């Protein structure tokens, strides 16, 4: 057996066992690596003023304030809301809602009977039990998310500290030319920077828009604005987790116009205008004006890759989706610019 074949057999065996050993941490390592790549320009800026260990720690501290603090805020506020529910008032609210729904559905006999049977099992006790189940699930999920976040932060320090060495090593190991490897890396890094900044600005815009509106109705605009901005990152439901309960609360107190305004404002101004119209425009602005990058990737493709990533990978899909898309497009462009051209030259 040739030494080369023997080496590749040993390498594949070792690679399999490495994947098996670290399979529970692969996603965390991937997220840490992507965050490091997207945030590395900040590290380069800090390196000019501090030692490597200090700048690495400061980068981790900044990301920790973005990842851990908001998560703690959500868990703390959500648990307070659930455990401070007044059962008597909540029962009255459910009874009132059932009456309103039954009264309006009486004009539609075809669905009235089915809805009535469904509402029979719809009570304050059942909803409270459901909320407690949700809170326990959220508690378990939040604990896992916090554990993953702490592990990611630990890996982030490692990646920031040895980032330059990792970069040079991978450029040398990849079976491509140095310029080809750099172009792939620059394309992925550029997309990550755009996505991270776009997501941060969108969360701030949506949170501020909701907080400024809701404060006029006597609610805590600061807390609800933060919760809405963070809830906007939740796949499928987003800010509806915040504005629907508030609209129901206003309805219960007879404030029909206020409830309708909150619903329309949240749907039309925030969900449609900010999330669906302003966000793609923001991607274009950040790409061309802030980073002044020459990336040849359509802005709408970046936008849809973020949506697809969230639907497949949850919260972290915001960066995983665009990364996969950018990497694949970079490979296609590499194939087009180098391999096809070389084949054409060989034919000539």
UniProtKB/Swiss-Prot annotation:
Top-level taxonomic group: Bacteria
Entry keywords, A to Z: Cell membrane, Membrane, Transmembrane, Transmembrane helix, Transport
Subcellular location: Cell membrane
Pfam family, one: AI-2E_transport
Topology within the bilayer: Multi-pass membrane protein
Protein name, UniProt field: Putative transport protein HP_0567
TM region positions: 6-26, 27-47, 56-76, 143-163, 194-214, 224-244, 266-286, 300-320
Taxonomic path: Bacteria, Pseudomonadati, Campylobacterota, Epsilonproteobacteria, Campylobacterales
Claim: Protein transport is one of the keywords in the record: no
Organism: Helicobacter pylori (strain ATCC 700392 / 26695)
């Amino acid at each position: 057996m040739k030494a080369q074949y023997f080496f590749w057999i040993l390498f594949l065996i070792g690679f399999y066992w490495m994947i098996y050993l670290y399979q529970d941490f692969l996603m965390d390592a991937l997220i840490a690596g992507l965050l490091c790549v997207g945030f590395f320009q900040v590290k380069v800026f800090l390196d000019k003023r501090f030692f490597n260990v200090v700048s690495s720690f400061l980068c981790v501290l900044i990301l920790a304030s973005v990842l851990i603090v908001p998560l703690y805020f959500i868990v703390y506020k959500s648990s307070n809301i659930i455990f401070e529910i007044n059962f008597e008032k909540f029962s009255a609210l459910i009874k009132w809602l059932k009456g309103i729904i039954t009264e309006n559905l009486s004009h539609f006999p075809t669905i009235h009977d089915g809805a009535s049977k469904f509402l029979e099992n719809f009570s304050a006790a059942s909803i409270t039990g459901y909320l407690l189940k949700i809170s326990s699930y959220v508690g378990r999920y939040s604990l896992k998310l916090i554990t993953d976040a702490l592990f990611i932060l630990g890996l982030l320090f490692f990646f920031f500290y040895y980032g330059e060495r990792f970069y040079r090593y991978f450029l040398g190991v990849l079976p491509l030319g140095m310029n080809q490897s750099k172009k792939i890396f620059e394309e992925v890094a550029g997309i990550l920077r755009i996505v991270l900044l776009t997501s941060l600005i969108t969360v701030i815009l949506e949170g501020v828009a909701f907080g400024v509106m809701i404060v006029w109705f006597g609610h805590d605009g600061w807390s609800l604005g933060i919760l809405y901005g963070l809830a906007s990152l939740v796949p499928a439901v987003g800010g509806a987790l915040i504005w629907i309960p508030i609209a129901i609360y206003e309805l219960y107190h007879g404030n029909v116009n206020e409830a309708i305004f909150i619903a329309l404002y949240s749907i039309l101004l925030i969900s449609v205008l900010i999330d669906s119209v302003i966000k793609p425009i923001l991607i274009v602005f950040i790409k061309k004006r802030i980073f002044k990058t020459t990336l040849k990737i359509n802005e709408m493709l970046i936008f849809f890759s973020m949506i697809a990533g969230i639907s497949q990978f949850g919260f972290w899909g915001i960066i995983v989706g665009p990364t996969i898309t950018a990497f694949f497009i970079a490979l296609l462009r590499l194939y087009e610019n180098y391999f096809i051209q070389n084949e054409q030259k060989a034919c000539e």
